[in-house]
Amino acid sequence: ALLHHGLNCAKGVLA
């Protein structure tokens, strides 16, 4: 769950 959240957060910030 944490890993998924980190990837999602990074993608959201980058996008």
Curated annotation (Swiss-Prot):
Main location: secreted
InterPro entries, alphabetized: Antimicrobial13 (IPR012516)
Entry's Gene Ontology BP terms: defense response to bacterium
One cellular component (GO) term of this entry: extracellular region
Location(s), subcellular: Secreted
UniProt entry keywords in alphabetical sequence: Amidation, Antibiotic, Antimicrobial, Disulfide bond, Secreted
Coiled-coil boundaries: none
Residues with PTM Alanine amide: 15
Assembly: Heterodimer with subunit A; disulfide-linked.
Function text: Antimicrobial activity against S.aureus and P.aeruginosa, possibly by attacking the bacterial cell membrane.
Name of the protein described by the UniProt record: Halocidin subunit B
